[in-house]
Amino acid sequence: MAEHFLLILSLIFSTPAPSLQRASGGRVPSTRLIGTVNKVAEGCGCYFRPAGEDASSKRYIFFEDASEGAPLMNIGGRDVRLRLISSTEPPGGVGRKGERFSRRYAAGDIKIRMSFVAISVCPGPYNPECVANSYDVTITASKGARRQTVKAEGGCGC
């Protein structure tokens, strides 16, 4: 009898509450913080998409139009303009493959940290055949108690 009681208790406590099951068709709602930017223009700037996504994809999770200055990310379901807090990027720009740097951004209670690794770099001085540097990036976003880290890839240039 005690064994049956323990079995029933374990089944009750291992099943999600019915309200959570109904919220998303039987699954617990996602806690994803970083989404796809809704507004993306073509032209010079920095564009990053989730790692592994097709290179022709326009699903960017970070977008910075060189003419607008303030980058965009979709955080918690809405596009947010970020302001740069700090950067360890060399003043003259990245000079070699494998070089690392980071940037920190904020917008209200939203904090973003981006860690860059250069995958390909345009040789200096100006070379019209090389239009962008490519990077692998780790992006960590936090808003209040929520936090998410994603891997991304893309580049900066024209």
PLM region spans:
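Bacterial N-terminal signal peptides
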Residues: E3-S14
